[in-house]
Amino acid sequence: MQKLTLPAPAKLNLWLHIIGRRADGYHELETVFQFLDHGDELSFALRDDGVIRLHTEIEAVPHDSNLIVRAARMLQAQSGTTLGADIWLTKVLPMGGGIGGGSSDAATTLLALAHLWQLDWDEDRLAALGLSLGADVPVFVRGHAAFAQGVGEQLTPVDPIEPWYVVLVPQVSVSTVEIFSHPQLTRDSLPLKMRPVPEGNSRNDCQPVVEQNYPEVRNALNSLGKFTEARLTGTGSCVFGAFPSKAEADKVLALLSATQTGFVAKGSNVSMLHRKLQSLVKKSSA
């Protein structure tokens, strides 16, 4: 196979608790990740000259600093391959939105190039490499909804309900560093003792600080909160609410469209990236 096109799905933090701070400054978290059937798209074409080249209309991030390029070059170096790739990014997910855009792009890149370069790398090895790029990358590599601990890299598969979501996208980018360094951030939530993880935990410890500092996010939460429980994902800026049907979610988004930007997507416990990869494996073995 010389060319490959794959999705890079969004994720939600259904809830997020901060239970402590480590000596290295990183925070200890407990959260549940679930995927959305909505995301970026990446296409990969094989090169035999070892060059990694990203083609995108997004100019906010320098080419060599882009997580996609960093992921590709890291996999190239660690595997010892002499192959390269042209990569085309169709960007849909917002940057600074808390729905995993950059991390998801990096994970899709690792999985796609491992496939395209015919590397004998399993998920464990790719996830470990992904962690060096960002704490959220491993869950996208694994591709299953998960209860996450540590900085978000210790993953236990879970299967929460899969509703339809309205996701509002405030026109502001929230700085994760700013939120996690804020003096008013809650850092002492009690670790969960129950297993399996209860679904009733409906709190994001970052939300009060983000609401206080970003009025656009506060307005989005208030708007969506008139129809269902609205919550921040990650450190934002995106907020979400669950609905039992697409029709109901579409109706609410339409009612909010005069003042809010957003989208409707289905929650999924197996990412659309992994569903696509599984279908490719089935086709190749047929």
Swiss-Prot record:
Top-rank EC class of the record's enzyme: transferase
One GO term of the biological process aspect: terpenoid biosynthetic process
Q: What is its EC number?
A: 2.7.1.148
Q: Which InterPro entries match?
A: GHMP_kinase_C_dom, GHMP_kinase_C_sf, GHMP_kinase_N_dom, IspE, Ribosomal_Su5_D2-typ_SF, Ribsml_uS5_D2-typ_fold_subgr
Pathway noted in the entry: Isoprenoid biosynthesis; isopentenyl diphosphate biosynthesis via DXP pathway; isopentenyl diphosphate from 1-deoxy-D-xylulose 5-phosphate: step 3/6
Q: Does the keyword RNA-binding apply?
A: no
The protein's matches in Pfam families, at most eight in alphabetical order, are given as: GHMP_kinases_C, GHMP_kinases_N
Q: Which UniProt keywords apply?
A: ATP-binding, Isoprene biosynthesis, Kinase, Nucleotide-binding, Transferase
Binding-site positions, ATP: 94-104
Keyword match Nucleotide-binding: yes
Catalytic residues as annotated in Swiss-Prot or TrEMBL: 11, 136
GO molecular function list: 4-(cytidine 5'-diphospho)-2-C-methyl-D-erythritol kinase activity; ATP binding
| Sequence similarity | Belongs to the GHMP kinase family. IspE subfamily.
Function text: Catalyzes the phosphorylation of the position 2 hydroxy group of 4-diphosphocytidyl-2C-methyl-D-erythritol.
Q: What is this protein called?
A: 4-diphosphocytidyl-2-C-methyl-D-erythritol kinase
Q: What is the organism lineage in this UniProt record? A: Bacteria, Pseudomonadati, Pseudomonadota, Gammaproteobacteria, Pseudomonadales
